[in-house]
A protein has these predicted regions:
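Bacterial N-terminal signal peptides that target proteins for export
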Residues: 2-10
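Bacterial N-terminal signal peptides
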Residues: 11-18
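C-terminal motif of bacterial Sec signal peptides marking the signal peptidase cleavage site
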Residues: 20-23
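N-terminal targeting/tethering segments
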Residues: 27-145
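Long, compositionally biased
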Residues: 149-151
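Conserved small/polar residues in nucleotide/adenosyl-binding loops
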Residues: 154-155
Length: 156
C-alpha cells in the first residue's frame, strides 16, 4: 500500500513539474518542480532551477544531433510525436523521471553501501568549475547553469 501511495505522489509531482516546465516566461529558480515523499523518508524537493538546467542540457545534446536533420521545429512538430506526445513533451517527462531517479538513488546510497568519497566530491567540483569556465556567460545563462547545478548533474 505504501508503494501505491508513493507512486501516486511521484506521478502527481511529475505532472505538476511537467506543467511548470512548459510555462511561458522566465523560470522561478527557487520554485519546487518535484516533491517526492514516502512514509518512511523525509521529503525530497527539486527546484525548478535544477529541473530547467537538466532539461536545457539534454535539449542542447539533442539539438546538436537532430536539428540538422529535422529542422528547428522538431521539438514541437507533431509529425515526430510518439504516444501522443511531441518531442518536447517526451523529453520533459524523461528529464523529470531522470531527476527523480537521481535523487532517490542518492537518498538510498547508504542502503547499498555506496558513497561519494571526498576524492569523488573534489573531482566533481573540479569538473563543474571546468564546465563553468569552458562556457561563455551567455551560454551559462541560456541553460541556467550554476556551479551547484553542474555538481548535482555530475553526481548523478
Amino acid at each position: 500500500m505504501r508503494f501505491k501511495k508513493f507512486a501516486a505522489i511521484i506521478l502527481m509531482s511529475t505532472m505538476i513539474g511537467t506543467m511548470s516546465l512548459s510555462g511561458c516566461g522566465g523560470v522561478n529558480k527557487d520554485a519546487v518542480a518535484i516533491t517526492m515523499t514516502s512514509d518512511d523518508k523525509d521529503a525530497i524537493e527539486v527546484t525548478m532551477g535544477y529541473a530547467n538546467f537538466a532539461a536545457r542540457i539534454q535539449q542542447a545534446g539533442y539539438d546538436s544531433v537532430f536539428a540538422s536533420y529535422y529542422g528547428d521545429d522538431y521539438w514541437t512538430n507533431d509529425s515526430y510525436a510518439k504516444d501522443g506526445k511531441n518531442m518536447q513533451e517526451s523529453i520533459k517527462d524523461s528529464v523529470l523521471e531522470s531527476i527523480e531517479t537521481q535523487y532517490l538513488l542518492e537518498k538510498h546510497m547508504s542502503d547499498y553501501g555506496v558513497e561519494i568519497t571526498e576524492e569523488d566530491q573534489a573531482a566533481i567540483k573540479k569538473a563543474a568549475e571546468q564546465f563553468m569556465s569552458d562556457n561563455s556567460k551567455a551560454a551559462l545563462k541560456e541553460v541556467g547553469a550554476t556551479q551547484e547545478y553542474v555538481c548535482l548533474l555530475y553526481t548523478s
